[in-house]
Amino acid sequence: MAETTLFRNVRVFDGENEVPSEETDVLVRGSTIEGVGPAADGDTTVDGGGRVPMPGPIDAHWRSMINSLPAEAFLGAEIGYINHLAAREAERTLMRGSTTVRDAGGPSSGLKRAIDEGIVAGPRIYPCGAMISQSSGHGDFRMPHEVPRTPMSPLSRVMQVGAARIADGAEGGSARHPRATDARRR
């Protein structure tokens, strides 16, 4: 059974009244509020001092890998180093109060697993995977010399570290738009 935490002397905002309640107790088991009102005991007791507890906010546009260092450094850094910085940023994000994040693009599944297994501290992560972006869009981190020129060109750094995109913008012509290639060449 999950441990309990008893928050004593807290005021609860219930969403129905305009002001928080008088001081009361909130019992939490694991990560679930089990009860509000006078409670006998918990495995851990925290005196709220009349404050209003709130669940941790959700950051719906967070990037585990990119938030950890400036873009210029990110583009040239070794992936193992980036992973360590991302773990540090995850802990900082949690300490700022966000208990859940939606990763908005990048290879965050390994970091999510490390957090879920208790290896590193961080918020609950809902990973996105690769960013979908058109060529030269905000999710295209390729340097000009990395753009493949032939089918056998070496993989770009973005592809090597597993952050490749799923889709790309219009490339060449098609039966419906045969002049797309001509427009690109102008």
Model-based region annotation:
Residues 10, 26, 31, 50, ...:
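Divalent metal-coordination and catalytic microenvironments
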Residues 40-43, 114, 155:
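Metallo-beta-lactamase
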Residues 46, 102-103, 127:
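General beta-strand structural signal in soluble alpha/beta enzymes
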Residues 119-186:
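Metal-coordinating catalytic core of metallo-dependent amide/deamination hydrolases
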